[in-house]
Amino acid sequence: EWCGTNSDCGEGECCTGGSFNRH
């Protein structure tokens, strides 16, 4: 699953600085 903005983060392992990271 992917997220694109910090507001998408909830697990503490995604989206830092608006970057795309898996979580």
Curated annotation (Swiss-Prot):
State the family it belongs to: Belongs to the u-CNTX family.
Cellular component, GO annotation:
extracellular region
Location in the cell: Secreted
UniProt KW keywords: Secreted
* Lineage top rank: taxon: Eukaryota
Kindly report the protein's main subcellular placement as a broad class: secreted
The reply on keyword tRNA processing is no
What is the protein's species of origin? Ctenus ornatus
The tissues in which it is expressed are:
Expressed by the venom gland.
Is Secreted tagged as a keyword? yes
Question: Under what name is this protein listed?
Answer: U22-ctenitoxin-Co1a
